């Protein structure tokens, strides 16, 4: 059979789709994507070039394709009474070729031969080149993965990709899209609507070593190296577009082009694991129900990244909340004790208060990580020891800083919220694992641990471990709960949030926690103050609120959480009345059904079941 002749008039260009690594080694690339076999065998970084050959460009001029009628209407001799052109007037843009030679050259031998030419490029062009390379690499990877993995089940695999310059290479199982909020956190720019005086008051800014100060914007190259935050603004009209100011050249930093960056933390965590923790797993959901600043979504991850340049402890604590990262809890808790040993005998002064704040943050993250990733069936005595020791350390820290934080207000919102979050987590942990029941019944008569020492190495701890600290309030928690933490919070913060749903959530939760403690430990609750008027109006309207069933699909997570707490308070205050308890249980089940059928993110649905199923499990009608 004769071969079909190719059309000689068609000019064909030779294309190269192999990786840059094989080309640099002068070997033939098998072109497997996203990682070629050569790089897999030799354990090398597989870079895939995006714009290596500047040969073909196509420009589109909108004026060339305008309808003739429109062009005639734009003639200067058109009628004075002609109708105005209602089509939007596009902003004229200059077409230019983006020179990415420096970005591509940085992949070859650390840019040694190209350093003399860096001064020929403006900082703006260099930055745009890096960002364009990042975007092209990301989009190319996602499209390739979508084709290769269509109809197949994703499996965990290390693709061997790593970061170079500002390039973020997602792992094979990643389905995460770029999120400006996450990129904003990576650069630790506090949200513009937050009052930095509330987050970090002036009294604590004179520290000699304020590791959490957001003044240093240099981050680890394994996360993002000198990438500006993408700012999303509404589309501007022509006049506004012309009035936009030019970019400040001082914000550009290209030190990575002149000197290699190396750090022992370079490959400790994959960037996609960090992004997935915030974007997909939404570890912060339960904690941020109690604050409208989204502290655990926006502030804490940025803080952990910021100080990890010198100390990765808080970042390790944060990553312990991830389902895809295995953090050694023994090493983590020992490091926590080492940091506490440096503070427990030190005087509490303004310059040192942030170090105590970091200890409190670590307690929150370790408790939360265990709570999210350990089911009741998988709970071991070792987990109980960690839970109890974290609560015990919390008691020691409060004893140390109580006088200072109550007499030197305002405290930072992070410090105050960390204290609140630990008490809240203790309550949810107690309900999830039934610690109060175990402490009152199984451990009844057992002498609780009264020593000041916190240890994880004593083998005797893992036989019928003590859970007294995680199950009960310490004296300082009782003081704070009695006045709803008003002796800690910033004055303006309490006023501005008084009408918010997060404040309602806290009012309901504080009341429920105190009532629950009085029921379980009446002998230890003499100092607790209960004000039933705080929630009386809320719970009396709870039974009628659910009549607006059509609106439940559009509620935010805080509204659902408030409904759960209201219904459980009704059950607690109505014990002995089977009809009321049964109606409350029916409404709670209705809430779960609405959540399952709503447009809520699937991860949030799962967390609601994990965090609030106890509202159904506790207190049922008593059969005659």
From Swiss-Prot:
It comes from the Eukaryota. One of its GO terms (molecular function) is zinc ion binding. Its main location: nucleus. Residues 19-46 bind DNA. The keyword Membrane does not apply. InterPro entries: Zn2-C6_fun-type_DNA-bd_sf, Zn2Cys6_DnaBD. Disruption phenotype: Stabilizes the opaque phase. Residues 237-250 have a biased composition (Polar residues). GO terms for biological process: biological process involved in symbiotic interaction; cell adhesion; cell adhesion involved in single-species biofilm formation; cellular response to glucose starvation; filamentous growth; filamentous growth of a population of unicellular organisms in response to biotic stimulus; invasive growth in response to glucose limitation; mating. Residues 63-84, 230-250 are annotated as: Disordered. Interacts with MCM1. Transcription factor that binds the promoters of genes involved in biofilm formation, which include several key adhesion genes, and recruits MCM1 to these sites. Plays an important role in hyphal growth and virulence. Promotes conversion of opaque cells to white phase, but needs existence of EFG1, a key regulator required for maintenance of the white state. This is Adhesion and hyphal regulator 1. It comes from Candida albicans (strain SC5314 / ATCC MYA-2876) (Yeast).
């Amino acid at each position: 059979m004769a071969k079909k002749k190719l059309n000689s008039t068609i000019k064909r260009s030779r294309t190269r789709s192999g990786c840059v690594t094989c080309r640099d080694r002068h070997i033939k690339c098998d072109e497997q994507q996203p990682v070629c076999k050569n790089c897999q065998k030799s354990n090398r970084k597989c870079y895939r070039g995006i714009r290596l050959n500047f040969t073909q460009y196509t420009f589109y001029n909108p004026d060339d394709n305008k309808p003739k009628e429109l062009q005639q209407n734009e003639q200067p001799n058109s009628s004075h009474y002609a109708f105005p052109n209602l089509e939007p007037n596009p902003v004229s843009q200059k077409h230019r070729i983006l020179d990415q030679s420096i970005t591509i050259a940085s992949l070859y031998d650390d840019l040694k031969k190209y350093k003399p030419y860096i001064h020929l490029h403006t900082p703006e062009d260099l930055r745009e080149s890096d960002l364009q390379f990042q975007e092209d690499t990301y989009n190319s990877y996602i499209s390739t993965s979508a084709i290769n993995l269509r109809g197949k089940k994703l499996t965990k695999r290390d693709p061997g990709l790593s970061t170079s310059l500002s390039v973020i290479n997602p792992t094979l199982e990643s389905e995460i899209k770029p999120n400006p909020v996450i990129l904003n956190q990576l650069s630790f720019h506090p949200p513009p609507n937050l009052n930095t005086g509330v987050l970090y008051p002036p009294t604590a800014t004179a520290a000699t070593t304020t590791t959490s100060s957001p003044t240093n914007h240099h981050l680890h190259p394994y996360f993002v190296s000198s990438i500006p935050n993408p700012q999303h603004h509404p589309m501007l009209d022509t006049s506004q577009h012309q009035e936009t100011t030019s970019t400040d050249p001082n914000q550009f930093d290209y030190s990575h082009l002149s000197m290699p960056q190396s750090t022992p933390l370079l490959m400790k965590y994959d960037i996609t694991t960090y992004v997935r923790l915030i974007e997909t797993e939404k570890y912060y959901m339960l904690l941020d129900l109690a604050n409208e600043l989204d502290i655990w979504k926006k502030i804490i991850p940025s803080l952990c990244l910021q100080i990890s340049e010198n100390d990765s402890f808080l970042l390790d604590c944060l990553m312990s909340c991830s389902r895809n990262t295995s953090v050694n809890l023994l090493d983590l808790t020992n490091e926590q004790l080492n940091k506490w040993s440096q503070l427990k005998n030190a005087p509490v002064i303004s310059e040192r208060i942030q170090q105590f704040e970091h200890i409190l943050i670590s307690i929150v993250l370790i408790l939360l990580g265990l709570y999210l990733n350990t089911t009741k069936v998988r709970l071991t005595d070792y987990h109980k020891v960690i839970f109890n020791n974290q609560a015990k350390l919390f008691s020691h820290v409060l004893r140390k800083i109580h006088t200072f934080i109550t007499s030197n207000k305002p405290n930072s919102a992070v410090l105050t919220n960390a204290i609140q979050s630990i008490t809240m987590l203790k309550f949810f942990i107690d309900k999830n694992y039934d610690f109060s029941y175990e402490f009152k019944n199984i451990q009844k008569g057992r002498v609780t641990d009264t020593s000041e020492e916190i240890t994880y190495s004593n083998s005797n701890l893992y036989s019928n471990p003590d859970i007294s600290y995680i199950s009960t309030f310490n004296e300082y928690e009782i003081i704070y709960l009695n006045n709803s933490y008003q002796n800690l919070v910033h004055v303006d913060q309490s006023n501005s949030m008084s009408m918010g749903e997060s404040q309602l959530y806290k009012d309901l939760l504080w009341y429920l926690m105190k009532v629950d403690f009085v029921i379980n430990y009446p002998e230890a609750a003499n100092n607790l103050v209960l004000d039933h008027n705080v929630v009386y109006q809320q719970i009396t309207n709870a039974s009628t609120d659910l009549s607006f069933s059509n609106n439940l699909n559009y509620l935010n997570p805080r509204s659902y959480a408030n409904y759960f707490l209201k219904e459980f308070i009704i059950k607690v205050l109505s014990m002995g009345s089977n009809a009321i308890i049964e109606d409350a249980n029916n409404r709670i089940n209705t809430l779960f059904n609405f959540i399952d059928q709503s447009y809520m993110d699937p991860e949030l649905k799962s967390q609601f079941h994990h965090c609030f199923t106890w509202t159904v499990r506790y207190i049922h009608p008593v059969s005659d």
